[in-house]
Amino acid sequence: MGTARFLSAVLLLSVLLMVTFPALLSAEYHDGRVDICSLPSDSGDCLRFFEMWYFDGTTCTKFVYGGYGGNDNRFPTEKACMKRCAKA
């Protein structure tokens, strides 16, 4: 039973790394920190339905968020998204 749990944990960690690592590679960094506005949209892991906004590099776009997980390029309103990500 211990081996099965270990393998399950390794599998889960592998999946999380496969999902997270490409997003981090595509992100832009400023002062050593990830620019959240450069992250891709990420609907998360759950199956709930929340209308949210993400910055697509040009403007804020509506998407469906599942309620858990995802990344920080997620805003409750278009106004909040534009305030954080739109360049003047």
From Swiss-Prot:
Keywords: Disulfide bond, Protease inhibitor, Secreted, Serine protease inhibitor, Signal. Residues 37-85 form the BPTI/Kunitz inhibitor domain. Belongs to the venom Kunitz-type family. 03 (sub-Kunitz) subfamily. The record marks L47, R48 as: Reactive bond for chymotrypsin. Residues 1-27 form the signal peptide. It is found in: Secreted. This is Kunitz-type U15-theraphotoxin-Hs1a. The record marks L39 as: May bind Kv1. It comes from Cyriopagopus schmidti (Chinese bird spider). SUPFAM superfamilies: BPTI-like. The lineage of its organism: Eukaryota, Metazoa, Ecdysozoa, Arthropoda, Chelicerata. Residues 28-33 form a propeptide.
